[in-house]
């Protein structure tokens, strides 16, 4: 496994995080969603994203001095977790999620079909299946909750 370092988001990361998001949606999530859905999802409104990231706690996974994934949290809600497809199945998403699981009493996420098994491996449970609209396309996702077992 590569040496993964986790650090706080820096404004200079913005374009690389956008690229990771686009690649993750178009290459990884395309296994579970139609071309129309991917086209609707894989768009970035830069001003909205910058505003969202400013309101969030964001951590970036670094391998060989390059951002390869990121996670963002607003209070107890995981808003985004994306890994560059070149680095999937190498522990990047786990390295981003594990510190949150250790530090939070509860976490929630709206997980894609693609991400649902990953979150289940860490003890997240599906609260409900949802149909959500994004730019005219309808998606299935899952509202999931994590509570530590005591």
Swiss-Prot record:
Transmembrane segments: none
Enzyme Commission number(s) of this protein: 2.3.1.-
CDD domains: NAT_SF
InterPro entries xrefs: Acyl_CoA_acyltransferase (IPR016181), GNAT_dom (IPR000182), N-acetyltrans/Recomb-assoc (IPR052564)
Residue ranges constituting the N-acetyltransferase domain according to the UniProt record: 4-149
Gene Ontology MF: a single term: acyltransferase activity, transferring groups other than amino-acyl groups
UniProt key word Transmembrane helix: no
Enzyme class: transferase
Entry annotated with the keyword DNA repair: yes
PANTHER family, per database record: ACETYLTRANSFERASE, ACETYLTRANSFERASE (GNAT) FAMILY PROTEIN
NCBIfam families, per the entry: PRK09831.1
Listed name of the protein: Uncharacterized N-acetyltransferase YafP
Source organism per UniProt: Escherichia coli (strain K12)
Lineage of producing organism: Bacteria, Pseudomonadati, Pseudomonadota, Gammaproteobacteria, Enterobacterales
